[in-house]
UniProtKB/Swiss-Prot annotation:
Key word Cytoplasm present: yes
UniProt keyword ATP-binding, yes or no: no
Naturally occurring in which organism (per UniProt): Homo sapiens (Human)
Record family assignment: Belongs to the Rho GDI family.
UniProt keywords, alphabetically: Cytoplasm, GTPase activation
Cellular compartments per GO CC: cytoplasmic vesicle; cytosol; membrane; plasma membrane
Family matches, as InterPro entries: Ig_E-set, Rho_GDI, RhoGDI_dom_sf
Bilayer-spanning residue ranges: none
Function: Inhibits GDP/GTP exchange reaction of RhoB. Interacts specifically with the GDP- and GTP-bound forms of post-translationally processed Rhob and Rhog proteins, both of which show a growth-regulated expression in mammalian cells. Stimulates the release of the GDP-bound but not the GTP-bound RhoB protein. Also inhibits the GDP/GTP exchange of RhoB but shows less ability to inhibit the dissociation of prebound GTP.
Entry's localization field: Cytoplasm
Protein's name in the database: Rho GDP-dissociation inhibitor 3
GO BP, sorted A to Z: blastocyst hatching; negative regulation of cell adhesion; regulation of protein localization; Rho protein signal transduction
GO MF terms, alphabetically ordered: GTPase activator activity; Rho GDP-dissociation inhibitor activity
Main location: cytoplasm
């Protein structure tokens, strides 16, 4: 894509607001200067700990006398989210969909039921085709930052691939979010055909594991194999 759609722009603005508010909190709590350069969001730094999370209500009530910030928050955060079932997680992943113009139709993986059955199901991907992955999810109560979807692919017990999709930051909404990955090409050739086990994880910058599941993938010469 050459530009940003409304969802991507909103996610980036939401992340900027979160970082600005976290900076204020850190400055107020530490009674000193800004955080050290080493204290950055980097998974390669094992000692990194994310700043204390502020609830959506706390963010709305922060700096009530700052009119410009209050206006910015009203535009960005929108109305208060409707009440939801308290038993639901804050982030609810509903579906994973394989999209390909060369496929007979979308290949849909339902993630709202018994995830254990997915390990015994086989999702077919035709070799050499162009495809994208659509991730559908809901955010119910609090802002979530740095969502990412990871896929570890195994064959005969050995990991042969690791894919990470950076999904972004989102606020609570009654509407379901959809994130579509860039176009990729499926591998081809006799050496790559056959069954695989994929271990998937939906997580965020706080390393909260919102959902993890295993599923079967088979790269075949045709969609019906």
């Amino acid at each position: 894509m050459l530009g940003l759609d409304a969802c991507e722009l909103g996610a980036q603005l939401l992340e900027l607001l979160r970082l600005a508010l976290c900076a204020r909190v850190l400055l107020a709590d530490k009674e000193g200067g800004p955080p050290a350069v080493d204290e950055v969001l980097d998974e390669a730094v094992p000692e990194y700990r994310a700043p204390g999370r502020k609830s959506l209500l706390e963010i709305r009530q922060l700096d009530p006398d700052d009119r410009s910030l209050a206006k910015y928050k009203r535009v960005l955060l929108g109305p208060l989210p409707p009440a939801v079932d308290p038993s639901l997680p804050n982030v609810q992943v509903t579906r994973l969909t394989l999209l390909s113009e060369q496929a007979p139709g979308p290949v849909v993986m339902d993630l709202t039921g018994d995830l254990a059955v997915l390990k015994d199901q086989v999702f077919v991907l035709k070799e050499g085709v162009d495809y994208r992955v659509k991730i559908s999810f809901k955010v119910h109560r609090e802002i979530v930052s740095g969502l990412k979807c990871l896929h570890h692919t195994y064959r005969r017990g050995l990991r042969v691939d690791k894919t990470v999709y950076m999904v972004g930051s989102y606020g609570p909404s009654a509407q379901e979010y959809e994130f579509v990955t860039p176009v990729e090409e499926a591998p081809r050739g006799a050496l790559v055909r056959g069954p695989y086990l994929v271990v998937s994880l939906f997580t965020d910058d706080d390393r909260t594991h919102h959902l993890s599941w295993e599923w079967g993938l088979c790269i075949c010469q045709d969609w019906k194999d």
